Amino acid sequence: MSEADFHEMRDPRIEKVVVHMGVGEGGRELAKAEDILEEITGQESVRTISGRASQDFGVRRGEPVGAKVTLRGDTAVEFLETALPIADLSVSSFDETGNFGFGVEEHTEFPSQEYDPQIGIYGLDVTVNLVRPGYRVKKRDKRSRQIPSSHRMTVEDAVAFIESTFDVEVEE
């Protein structure tokens, strides 16, 4: 973004960060995953339910298979400050509207976590949704409208925002 293009309504911001752990089964494994998520994010997790049955994985429809936490505002920024240095971000991680996601293979990579043989090792997925002011126009109930193409986030805008805000390198 050049100096001429700068306007406060074009300044990107983080709408939400979703941290997800897919366990594939309920019971003790899911309870352990929920505890880990709550320790890492500092927020209570919500169980995710399977949408359809899969005989190959032994999962029935409506069965709990994972846990997730949605972070917004300052807690989302604080979480990203600890999670982004762990992750290897590349431009291919970003979609055409500037959202991006990354995975953390082991929860023990977070500074607050240590390996515990009773718990084991869990991986997690992080999805970040970036928006600009004015995006509510698309989501509101009355008189909702499309966001003009000139105001939509691009991959370049998102990469520049992440690199400048969190001081991380995004690989090509």
UniProtKB/Swiss-Prot annotation:
Keyword field contains RNA-binding: yes
GO CC, any one term: ribosome
Pfam family, one: Ribosomal_L5_C
Gene3D superfamilies cross-referenced by the UniProt entry: 3.30.1440.10
Domain of life: Archaea
Cystines in this chain: none
GO biological process, one term: translation
Signal sequence bounds: none
Keyword terms: Ribonucleoprotein, Ribosomal protein, RNA-binding, rRNA-binding, tRNA-binding
Sample GO molecular function, one term: rRNA binding
Job of this protein: This is one of the proteins that bind and probably mediate the attachment of the 5S RNA into the large ribosomal subunit, where it forms part of the central protuberance. In the 70S ribosome it contacts protein S13 of the 30S subunit (bridge B1b), connecting the 2 subunits; this bridge is implicated in subunit movement. May contact the P site tRNA; the 5S rRNA and some of its associated proteins might help stabilize positioning of ribosome-bound tRNAs.
Family: Belongs to the universal ribosomal protein uL5 family.
Assembly and interaction partners: Part of the 50S ribosomal subunit; contacts the 5S rRNA and probably tRNA. Forms a bridge to the 30S subunit in the 70S ribosome.
Protein name stated in the entry: Large ribosomal subunit protein uL5
